[in-house]
Regions:
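Conserved lysine of the Walker
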Residues: 32-33
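Accessory nucleic acid-recognition modules appended to NTPase machines
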Residues: 182-360
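Hydrophobic anchor at the beta1->P-loop junction of P-loop NTPases
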Residues: 24
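N-terminal pre-Walker A segment at the start of P-loop NTPase domains
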Residues: 1-13
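Short glycine-rich substrate-engagement loop in P-loop NTPases that contacts/grips substrate
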Residues: 43-72
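Interdomain motor-coupling "hinge/lid" segment immediately C-terminal to the ATP-binding subdomain
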Residues: 115-228, 232
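Conserved catalytic/switch belt of AAA+ P-loop NTPases
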Residues: 85-109
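Domain-level recognition of nuclease-like catalytic cores that cleave nucleotide substrates
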Residues: 406-431
Length: 431
């Protein structure tokens, strides 16, 4: 398969220039190892079945031997031997050179045995990686740059068009951003990747992540409940009640344990609330918005197909929002981006608040169809006006006004409304 350029490529190059080592973290199958291999000069795969035991024996006795090789040296699935973390850190200190190692792994390491003595602060830079955005999978036209939207107030987007119909967006969400799915000819086979991903997570990885035996059936129920409530503010107690209909003895601590394991596997990645001081704390919703790292996980967990989603556009609206969140995380990485949401008791909301490292931010609503654009724009303008009203009385620490108001759509044409709200099809965006 020909390597498709990733937005992470540039991020990795910059981090290798700045740090002695880079740790790439993210869900399995999202392309971490393949991306790292484009810039590494030597490689060791810790999970190679023919060499694993020998590698582990070496790690126990003299881990520095595993670090010998041309640099940058890629250590794939390093968490198999957590002691390698300190070995990398010490070697970086001794060599005092940049770009020595790349570490990849698909789990957050729980160091129960005390094998990691030090953090990697200043030596090992952590770089998140996600499944492919629509631009990386060559489906977004990339005619609208997220960076330019922030940097250039006069940036003209009017008339720029997406090549993706709603049907194509639905298929892309069902297939997901898994690189392996793009190396398959038939659409039926492409859809199997996400389905198999969910099976592997539930049957194997959820127990393997920390060595605690967990029930695949319960893992499936929890993922299905999450999928039913994707991009909503549903409480854990409601999801637990949903699950106990089929598994009566499931407790909240058990539910929390499974969700925590799925978070360590980078499967679940909830969206936190944005709570600016524009209303009383009690008026602003502060619970997490339920989200997967890729929309295809929700589709597979629900057992849905492109056809069933075409007949249920209400459900696809939530899955579309998950796809918007994934792509915005990818596109905003170089800008230090992070996402949150806003929702208050008066039903004033912004589906996504995209924050940049320098303090700039965008309020974003995700609306699949053109009929919903007016409603989305209305919410954004009301929220901006609320911030302005608050600033009239808050002179010491005024809240920054949003730099952008955007309605992300599944439509085909981009334009700027007279009120300044930008209407942007998801499949026109790039970084």
């Amino acid at each position: 398969m020909k390597y498709l350029d990733r937005i992470a490529d540039k991020m990795l190059r910059l981090r290798l220039e700045a740090f002695g080592a880079v740790q790439i973290v993210g869900p399995k199958w999202c392309g971490k190892t393949t991306t790292a291999m484009q810039q590494s000069k030597s490689l060791i795969k810790m999970q190679d079945p023919d060499k694993r035991e020998g590698y582990l024996a070496t790690a126990r006795t003299k881990p520095s031997l595993l670090l010998k090789g041309e640099t940058p040296r890629l250590i794939d699935e390093w968490q198999v031997a957590p002691v390698l973390w300190d070995a990398v850190r010490n070697t970086v200190d001794e060599r005092n050179q940049k770009g020595q190692f790349i570490l990849t792994g698909s789990t957050v390491v729980e160091d129960k045995n005390g094998e990691i003595m030090h953090t990697g602060t200043g030596r090992i830079s952590k770089m998140p990686m996600y499944p492919m955005s629509l631009y990386e999978s060559k489906e977004s036209t990339g005619s609208i740059s997220l960076r330019l939207l922030f940097d250039d107030p006069a940036y003209d987007i009017d008339g720029l068009q997406s090549d993706m119909t709603v049907e194509k967006l639905i298929f892309a969400a069902c297939r997901g951003g898994w690189p392996a799915s793009l190396d398959v000819t038939s659409q039926e086979a492409q859809l199997l990747i996400a389905q198999d991903y969910v099976n592997v997570i539930c049957d194997e990885d959820i127990s393997r992540v920390d060595g605690v035996r967990r029930q695949p059936a319960l893992a499936r129920l929890i993922m299905r409940s999450y999928a039913r409530n994707i991009c909503t503010l549903v409480k854990k107690s409601k999801m637990l009640a949903d699950i106990t209909v089929e598994m009566e003895k499931t407790s909240m601590p058990t539910f929390d344990d499974y969700v925590s394991a799925l978070q360590r596997l980078f499967v679940i990645e909830d969206v936190e609330a944005w709570c600016p001081a524009i209303r009383s704390a009690a008026a602003i919703r502060s619970g997490a918005k339920r989200c997967f790292v890729d929309p295809s996980i929700a589709v597979a967990a629900l057992g849905m197909s492109p056809r069933s989603l075409e007949l249920d556009l209400r459900t696809f609206g939530f899955i579309f929002e998950c796809m918007c969140i994934r792509d915005l995380k990818v596109y905003s990485q170089a800008l230090g981006g992070r996402v949150s949401y806003y929702h208050d008791r008066y039903d004033l909301e912004a589906d996504i608040v995209l924050h940049l490292a320098d303090g700039r931010y965008a309020l974003i609503e995700c609306k699949l169809g053109s009929r919903e654009i007016e409603d989305g724009a209305k919410h954004l303008l009301q929220l901006r006006d609320l911030i302005r009203e608050k600033n009239k009385t808050e002179h010491q620490m005024p809240l920054r006004e949003p730099d952008l108001l955007i309605v992300m759509t599944g439509g085909e044409m981009a334009y700027t409304r007279e009120d300044g709200v930008k209407v942007i099809p998801l499949a026109t965006l790039k970084d």
